[in-house]
Amino acid sequence: MTDRLDRGELLRLAAGAAAVGAAPTAVRHLFSKGGGFPQSHPRWRFVFVNHALTNPFFVPAKNGSHDAASLLGVDVKWAGSASSDVGQMVKAMRHAIAAEVDGIAVSIVDPTAFNSATRLALARGIPVLSYNADGGKQNGRLAYVGQDNYESGLELGARVVRLCSSGEVCLFIATPGQENIQPRVDGALDAIRDSGKRIRIHVVASGVHVGHERKKIEATYLANKNLRGLFAVDAGSTAGVAEVMRKYRLQKRGVCAGGYDLLPVTLRAIHDRHLDFTIDQQPYLQGFLPVLQMFLYRYSARLVAPADTNTGLNFVTRENVGRYLTTRSRFEGSSTSDRYPVR
């Protein structure tokens, strides 16, 4: 049956297999049945420019990029900043351009800082995609791969309204204004305001380092023990909320809590009833799909253009957290091992 699949079908199978956890070896077997795809090609070099290189959130994204590189016969390198330093990121992007790489994926966390480098790359024939963050509507990037952050913020706000019908709530953000997380705050604030509920929300900057985020969240709670909810819009802040909720047993005091992403401390807190939910944006796909799209752009002589791709929004709650805890794999960054098929 596989022998009759055309190349487009094989590519869709590859992306789908990555999404459900198929190993690169299994996906490569699909390609081997498709008439020799891919045929011999240069070993193209792709660079991911990132704002949080050491953040555990990006472990599955890096895994996805390297899996796609192994599958397609290309090279991938990650560069940028560990502390959301936009200057370092732009410098890394310009270095990649000077090195004449074959494609750049960049998390556009600033509305204007990357515009010039993007124009330069495109002028030199280097495709530029954004992933995880898509700030700056004037940026000329070819496509965005990631979650719709404003829409996910609306969903977050709706969940806050459902859990906390009134009272004071804190919403923690690592770096206010940064384009991968600020739109989530904006969406949440709009949803809460539009609900008409008597919820007073405080937006609190928690910082870029996970340990510091927890300390800031703890200090904020201790300064206002009447808070009805603790929520966050980034992985580190959500983990910090989880630790504070656990330490002070705040669920038993009627405090609601939730946030983003699938760090182990967050998932365990949901299982243990210290957090109500977290939102998954599938970081593995945010690494895998940009490589696939840049490859196809090169392989097709620029006939297959990169396309905007929403990597989705999934609420993880007590009802479905079990499979995330029992199935540890590199696809969610909880293990270095392949684990497939996931049943």
Model-derived regions, located:
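N-terminal secretory signal peptides and thylakoid transit peptides that target proteins
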Residues: 1-18
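Hinge/cleft segment of the Venus flytrap/periplasmic-binding protein
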Residues: 31-42, 180, 191-192, 288-343
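Hinge/beta->alpha junction and helix N-cap segments in small-molecule ligand-binding domains
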Residues: 49-62, 78-89, 110, 133, ...
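Signal peptide-proximal N-terminal region
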Residues: 63-80, 194-196
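Short, hydrophobic alpha-helical segments
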Residues: 97, 160-165, 221, 290, ...
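Hydrophobic alpha-helical
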Residues: 106-122, 188, 206-269
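Flexible loop/hinge segments that line or gate small-molecule binding clefts
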Residues: 112-151, 162, 168, 263-271, ...
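Exported/periplasmic ABC-transporter solute-binding proteins
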Residues: 228-229, 235, 242-312, 316-323
